[in-house]
């Protein structure tokens, strides 16, 4: 197996685009990082387990005003992320609070290490949907990629989620050349056998991924070519309003699908309607930059109307066009994936 530690990228001379008025409608979707802590240290997210990172988290009672401000600003779809959101000691209460606000969609992305004990409580609290991140079905590879994770715990968590009544769980896999790209068919068929939706992600050129993308990138076109015997020759299609993945149907059963997320080869900036909230309460209009608006003080003070105004201010800063193409290694690596949830 090839090394999975990041290697250096040649610097590109272009600077990040200047932020300007965004032409899209107001944000309808938000990803909220409730914590920047994680029990894994995946190679495309963190440089090491002991990287000197100082963890920060918005106080629990500040999240209520934050959620209300987002709702007033027009957000209809919420996804909770991390770090690892299930590490937050009050994650079930957070889900219950959001569910009571009647958002159209309430989802959570997890590494599933804590899901065996939390799947049923999360379902009872009102969580609609789950995405599970899993990059390999080989236990040793899993330990290598996550720097110590236990695959058995993750698989038990997935089983618990299915038993709790979660359906159409999405299985997210970051495909890395020489690391797990020989498992594409195994991962896809494993997900289908469990009525899950496999989604294959190109490594994104940000954070540690900025260093990995040059040597470990497998494009969606290559992934699809390798899976051609399993898939219909359809045009890949997005689910409107439900994220950037483009789906292709299975030959054996057209109700089964594979999603491809092309964060590098064919970016999706133009159709993005997503705002991100960091674990410290910063409103981030774009994953690829550190630009944003700090809403922590307004949330801590219990002023949802002020949070609402700050949401609109942050959205006005959303870049137009293809930000990825302008990323240098230095600027892209400065983005902390763990604090904004990817």
What are these regions (language model features)?
Residues 35-37, 101, 125, 251-253, ...:
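A short, compositionally biased micro-patch
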Residues 2-82, 86-105:
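Conserved alpha-helical substructure of the radical SAM core
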Residues 60-80, 84-201:
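Radical SAM/AdoMet-radical enzyme domain recognition
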Residues 41, 45, 140, 145, ...:
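Residues that scaffold the ATP/ADP-binding catalytic core of kinase and kinase-like folds
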Residues 36-38, 46, 134-136, 202, ...:
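Short, small-residue-rich loop/turn micro-motifs
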Residues 40, 139-140, 267, 293:
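Glycine-centered loop/turn positions within well-structured domains
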Residues 2-30, 189-193, 200-342:
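Auxiliary Fe-S-binding modules of radical SAM enzymes
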Residues 49-54, 138-145, 207-211, 294-295:
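A short acidic, helix-capping loop that chelates divalent metal ions and anchors anionic groups
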């Amino acid at each position: 197996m090839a090394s999975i530690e990041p290697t250096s990228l040649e610097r590109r001379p272009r600077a990040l685009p200047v932020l300007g008025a965004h032409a899209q409608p107001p944000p309808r979707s938000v990803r909220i990082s409730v914590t920047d802590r994680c029990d894994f240290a995946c190679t495309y997210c963190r440089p090491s387990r002991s990287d000197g990172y100082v963890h920060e988290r918005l106080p629990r009672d500040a999240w209520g005003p934050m959620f209300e401000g987002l709702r007033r600003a027009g957000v209809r779809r919420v996804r909770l992320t991390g770090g690892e959101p299930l590490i937050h000691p009050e994650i079930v209460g957070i889900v219950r609070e959001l569910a009571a606000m009647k958002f159209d969609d309430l989802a959570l992305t997890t590494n599933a290490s804590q899901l065996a004990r939390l799947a049923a409580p999360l379902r009872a609290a009102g969580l609609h949907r789950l995405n599970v991140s899993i990059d390999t079905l080989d236990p040793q590879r899993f330990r290598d990629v996550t720097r110590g994770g236990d695959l058995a715990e993750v698989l038990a968590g997935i089983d618990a989620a299915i038993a709790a009544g979660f359906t159409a769980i999405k299985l997210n896999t970051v495909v890395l050349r020489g690391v797990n790209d020989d498992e594409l068919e195994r991962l896809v068929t494993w997900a289908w056998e469990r009525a899950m939706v496999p989604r294959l992600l190109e490594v994104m050129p940000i954070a540690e991924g900025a260093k990995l993308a040059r040597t470990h990138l497998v494009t969606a076109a290559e992934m699809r070519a390798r899976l051609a015997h399993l898939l219909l020759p359809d045009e890949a299609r997005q689910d409107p309003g439900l994220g950037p993945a483009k789906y292709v149907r299975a030959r054996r059963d057209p109700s089964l699908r594979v999603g491809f997320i092309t964060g590098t080869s064919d970016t999706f900036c133009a159709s993005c309607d997503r705002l991100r909230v960091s674990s410290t309460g910063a409103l981030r209009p774009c994953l690829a930059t550190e630009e944003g608006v700090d809403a922590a003080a307004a949330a801590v003070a219990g002023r949802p109307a002020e949070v609402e105004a700050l949401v609109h201010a942050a959205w006005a800063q959303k870049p137009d066009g293809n930000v990825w193409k302008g990323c240098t290694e230095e600027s892209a690596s400065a983005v902390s994936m763990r604090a904004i949830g990817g």
